[in-house]
């Protein structure tokens, strides 16, 4: 079995979560997961295939991802219901599982398509089954729902009977004529099949997983059209530094690559074979060091491509961010290294939550660094990925590091931790993080106890200090854990000060401002005069020039309160609007266009995108 340096807290260990993360968590609960029409539609998609009078008119025959929706909903709802102590949502989960089980066919098939349109599946059904299995297994694990486990087992049997290495079975990667999709992402099914073996104790699933893994190289070589994932040998080469990510497969799909890495992580957790762990950690480290944006997002319109094809206006998808966060959490659990929690923080407080509408009702599929986010739409892979991670956000705040209590991320919150050989411990954060780096941590063991308290210090918090009660402040190591070992008394308190300086990411012509954990953006619709007449825009972010020195960006910035409904603080910066392009045919017409004008601009954390929307720019010109 795998070695772990950090153990996650259970969702029921989270007593409360507030602040910005809490607002987004509660919005996801109220306006997404508890939307009665949305959840109902997800399960009805599965039920319709068993109703012959509906099969010709109302079953789903397109190639893409709607069959996954119920799985991601179950996953998110189970975590959320336990964190929020929401009995009504727990009841709904049980009802959905019962209806899913009733919709399952005799051979174990659990999808949304009638038999005559499957060859062996419709479109992306292995991708869809990945999430259906995950949702069922989460409910079996967290809620002890045995019907969920049995339904997952029957689906798992269908999968390992239909695909595999034996005569008469389909390859996981191959040409499936007429199914409407290239069939190139099948290796991703590895993770939930391994997890199914863990939970059932049935060794057939692990044996199937390792046997099919041994065929990845051959299957991918025989199917060059697949650009979703890559062969096993190439994964080893990437982890070792012998290939770059865009060389794994031309136009490789970021999300599927991450999902396949999660499968190798599950194999390591089950078998303890170091090779699997080395591939995952090597890949995560290279992606973090070389391919993740400073907002935490990654890829260009879903794909890892050579760097010359990246641009701030390129689309950045939610899906690979959600599996990236899961990979980072896995690396954090294995190693206990603060860097992985820092990367989770980077993505959550910037690009990931920038894609969520502030009311929690939906997510943008794509959210570029500059331009405008794609208008949220009906159920799709990305808004379901968003609510899946949002449903478990609070579980990333705390953990046990070397069996000692640890604070991994900062947000107003409270959790009860049960560490081996220690009394029950309540940790409560009072803070306005990420707007402020001032945190009061209440440390409240049920009785006096000696233990080490681990506090993660972010890499940007130079000069961080911690003060226990009235003791002298102690300096804290930047980018690592501060470990405070002492006898803790009920009612103890630690004051943690994390300095937030204003820095920038800049080249010779463009820059982006950063304050502490937050990347900032210029939102046209958040300016005092957005220059909008009905649906006509007279000004865009690319018209803005900031008057800043990138060597000392903080000197040209003034902090002020943001509007009440927005994450702050706002940054007020002096700059100018460039002269308009001479678009009219005559000099007289062009003379009436606005001339260059100096003025103040208001920049806000990028995470406000789902509240402000419209045109924005993370990168702005400067002089």
Put a short name on every predicted segment:
Residues 1-87, 91, 119-143, 183-204, ...:
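Aromatic (Trp/Tyr) and acidic
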């Amino acid at each position: 079995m795998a070695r772990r340096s950090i153990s996650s807290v259970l969702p029921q260990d989270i007593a409360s979560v507030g602040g910005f993360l809490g607002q987004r968590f509660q919005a996801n609960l109220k306006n997404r997961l508890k939307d009665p029409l949305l959840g109902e539609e997800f399960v009805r998609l599965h039920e319709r295939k068993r109703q012959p009078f509906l099969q010709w008119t109302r079953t789903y025959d397109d190639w893409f991802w709607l069959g996954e929706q119920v799985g991601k909903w179950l996953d998110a709802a189970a975590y959320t219901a336990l964190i929020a102590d929401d009995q009504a949502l727990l009841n709904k989960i049980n009802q959905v599982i019962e209806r899913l089980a009733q919709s399952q066919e005799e051979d174990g098939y659990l999808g949304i398509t009638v038999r005559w349109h499957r060859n062996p599946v419709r479109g992306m059904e292995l991708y869809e089954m990945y999430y259906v299995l995950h949702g069922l297994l989460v409910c079996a694990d967290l809620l002890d729902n045995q019907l969920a486990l049995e339904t997952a087992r029957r689906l798992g049997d269908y999968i390992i009977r239909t695909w595999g290495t034996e005569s008469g079975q389909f390859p996981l990667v191959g040409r499936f004529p007429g199914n409407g999709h290239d069939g190139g992402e099948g290796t991703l099914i590895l993770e939930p099949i391994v997890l199914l073996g863990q939970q059932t104790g049935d060794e057939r699933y692990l044996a199937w997983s390792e046997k099919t893994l041994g065929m990845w190289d051959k299957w991918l070589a025989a199917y060059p059209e697949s650009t979703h994932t890559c062969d096993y040998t190439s994964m080893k080469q990437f982890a070792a530094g012998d290939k770059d990510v865009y060389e794994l497969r031309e136009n490789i799909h970021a999300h599927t690559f991450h999902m396949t890495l999660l499968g190798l992580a599950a194999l390591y957790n089950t078998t303890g074979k170091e090779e699997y762990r080395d591939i995952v950690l090597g890949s995560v480290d290279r992606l973090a060091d070389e391919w993740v944006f400073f907002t935490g997002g990654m890829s260009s319109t879903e794909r890892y491509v050579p760097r010359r094809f990246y641009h701030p206006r390129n689309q950045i998808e939610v899906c690979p961010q959600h599996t990236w966060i899961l990979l980072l959490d896995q690396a954090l659990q294995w190693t206990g290294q603060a860097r992985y929690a820092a990367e989770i923080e980077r993505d959550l407080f910037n690009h990931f939550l920038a894609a969520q509408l502030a009311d929690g009702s939906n997510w943008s599929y794509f959210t570029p660094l500059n331009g405008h986010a794609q208008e949220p739409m009906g159920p799709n892979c990305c808004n379901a990925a968003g609510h899946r991670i949002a449903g478990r956000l609070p579980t990333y705040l705390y953990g046990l590091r070397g069996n000692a209590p640890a604070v991994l991320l900062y947000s107003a919150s409270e959790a009860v931790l049960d560490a081996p050989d220690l009394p029950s411990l309540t940790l409560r954060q009072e803070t306005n993080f990420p707007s402020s780096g001032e945190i009061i941590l209440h440390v409240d063991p049920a009785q006096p106890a000696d233990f080490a308290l681990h506090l993660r210090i972010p890499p940007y918090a130079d000069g961080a200090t911690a003060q226990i009660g009235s003791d002298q402040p102690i300096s804290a190591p930047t980018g690592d854990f501060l470990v405070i070992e002492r006898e803790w008394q009920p009612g103890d308190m630690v004051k943690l000060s994390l300095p937030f300086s204003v820095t920038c990411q800049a080249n010779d012509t463009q820059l982006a401002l950063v304050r502490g954990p937050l990347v900032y953006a210029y939102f046209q619709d958040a300016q005092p005069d957005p220059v909008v007449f009905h649906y006509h825009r007279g000004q865009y972010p690319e018209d803005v020039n900031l008057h800043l020195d990138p060597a000392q960006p903080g000197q040209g910035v003034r902090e002020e309160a943001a509007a009440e409904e927005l994450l702050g603080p706002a940054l007020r910066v002096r700059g100018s609007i460039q002269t308009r392009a001479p678009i009219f045919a005559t000099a007289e017409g062009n003379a009436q266009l606005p001339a260059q004008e100096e003025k103040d601009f208001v920049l806000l954390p990028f995470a406000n995108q789902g509240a402000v929307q419209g045109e924005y720019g993370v990168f702005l010109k400067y002089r």
